[in-house]
Swiss-Prot record:
This is Putative pre-16S rRNA nuclease. Keywords: Cytoplasm, Hydrolase, Nuclease, Ribosome biogenesis. It comes from the Bacteria. It is found in: Cytoplasm. Could be a nuclease involved in processing of the 5'-end of pre-16S rRNA. GO terms for molecular function: nuclease activity. One of its GO terms (biological process) is rRNA 5'-end processing. GO terms for cellular component: cytosol.
Length: 154
């Protein structure tokens, strides 16, 4: 189920169980995982498959492996706050994913996270190809970190 309010989302979470975050794109998606205490977000991996059934199967495997209690999906909204084609694509994916999983899903504004992740990796001297292979997972960790920080204030 998609939860639009962070406070309501946090009330549905199981204690000592991690969250995952997804930075969903048309060519790949980044995955991040929190620790069980939900105090730290870490990049986990990047899925380069674009077939939605395979993507969902991969995500369900991650959810099961790490005993995840909730999902955060980055919502790409343009700088003015308007809905874009990418926003609609992510919303459609989120709605499809809810049919396969019985966990709360929270949609988090992800403006500029991929760019910030790319700049972060660049600051370590990472080459463009390597940055492109890792920026979505780092962006997912930034999205998740935003949610974790916000949940501390609830």
């Amino acid at each position: 189920m998609i939860i639009k309010n962070l406070q309501a989302f946090s009330r549905l979470l199981i204690l000592n169980s991690p969250l995952i975050a997804i930075d969903y794109g048309s060519k790949k998606l980044g995955i991040a995982l929190s620790n069980q205490e939900r105090s730290i977000a870490m990049p986990l991996n990047t899925i380069t498959e674009i077939n939605k059934k395979i993507v969902i199967t991969s995500l369900l495997s991650i959810v099961e492996k790490y005993k995840v209690c909730g999902v955060v999906i980055g919502m790409p909204i343009d700088m003015s706050g308007a809905v874009t084609e990418q926003t609609n694509m992510v919303m459609k994916f989120a709605e499809e994913f809810t049919k396969s999983i019985n966990l709360p899903i929270y949609l988090q504004d992800e403006r500029l996270t991929t760019k910030a992740a790319n700049n972060f990796l660049k600051s370590f001297g990472m080459k463009r190809k390597d940055r492109d292979n890792n920026d979505d997972a780092v962006a997912a960790s930034m999205i998740l970190e935003t949610v974790l920080d916000s949940m501390k204030n609830i």
